[in-house]
Amino acid sequence: MSTLGAAGAALLTPGKLRASTAMPGAVDGRAASGGGRLALTGLGSTGDIYGELGVTPIINAAGTYTTMGGSLMAPEVMEAMRLGNENFVSIDDLEVAAGKKMAELCRMPEGYTGLVTAGAAAALLVGYAAILTGDNKQYIQQIPDLTGMPKSEVIIQKSHRYPFDHQIRQNGVKLIEVETRDELIAAINPRTAAMHFTNFLNDAGQIKVDEFVKIAQQHNLPAYNDAAADTPPISRLWEYTHMGYDLVTFSGGKDIRGPQAAGLLMGKQDLIRCALLNMSPQEDTIGRASKVGKEEICGMLKALEMFVASDQDAILKEYHAQLDHIGNAVGQIPGVTAQYQYNATAIANVTPRLAVSWDPSKIALTSRQVTQQLAATRPYSIMLAGDGDSKQPPQNPTIWVTAWMMQPGQENVIAERLSEILKSGAKAS
């Protein structure tokens, strides 16, 4: 385990990195003491709640990974959640109102609305439940047992199978795999409930996103597009509903930076109404466990409002500057090269990254060793995507640094620590 130098350690004093973005008032609305924070006793009293719990905080140079907490919410989002906590409210009424606000912000077509769910995976669960049950109370209480129900199959391209189709299958349906347009059409039968499209796998399948929904419309079948990680660009929020997809989902806690336990389900009003019937606060439903609270709903709407109004070009410039700083630092080490990479036409996780490579004849380290040493840094662990690719050719070790979830100032820490690690592996000349 390695610790940062004096400069890096000073920067990472608990709470220091984000002190400039702290809300001026206390979390619960009462007068705050010292620096705009509510004075706590017991847990949280040091300002370093993770340290008190014995958990190592992370500098996230990887991306919006759920395993690391997704993203960090803006102070405005936290304030909206605080306001949502000030009163009791009918959750059903709040969801309906939230859906109307989502429709406005996301420029939905006439007849569409939205629903705040407990994440994108929960949106898959309750969205497909809505397709299967409608508003039939018996069916709602019965699924995932589909005995006696008219629909039990969902068509999906074989190349679009992915870990999150578990949430589709959780409803009891059978996934019917197809590869070609002809196979898709041949697979449609009276038991077909819907057609599923995995948006980030668009290039992997023979049937593309626009053609897929047209086929569904021609056969009067609902089409569901899972676009969970597919913002930015902001326009993705309305692109697929205007294509005609009946249901579309996005993660709330990735680039939109809403609560991590929140997601967005958009779709035709009747389907959204039935999705709400299949989830909390309703009891005896498949979605009861996927509870979303009033605070998450309010925070999610505020985050969405801010995301739609955000200046993505300015944000990209900030990312570029952070990665340039790291690249300039490590690029001075003999044998090391750093290259800025950005694919604006990518479908999912569209964000810049810095590829750092080195000549193994000059630096005797593998990419996995560098990644592991970064992760072992203290007091903050520096996490990259993956653990170093063991399949990389040994003559070209490379790691990737992402600025997406990096906080201001953390580029200095990464530059210092990564330079230290690479220099430690330098071979004597």
Model-inferred region functions:
Residues 384, 426-429:
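Conserved short beta-strand edge segments in small beta-sheet-based binding/regulatory domains
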Residues 56-92, 98:
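Glycine-rich phosphate-binding segment of PLP-dependent enzymes
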Residues 49, 331-420:
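Conserved C-terminal alpha-helix-loop-beta "cap" of PLP-dependent enzymes
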Residues 88, 202, 230, 407-408:
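Short strand->helix junction
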Residues 83-85, 199, 358, 403:
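Short glycine-centered, acidic/aromatic-flanked micro-motifs in structured strand/loop junctions
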Residues 1-17:
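N-terminal export leaders
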Residues 3-7, 21-59, 64-68, 99-104, ...:
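Conserved PLP-enzyme active-site core in the AAT-like
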Residues 304-328:
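Structural signature of PLP-dependent enzymes
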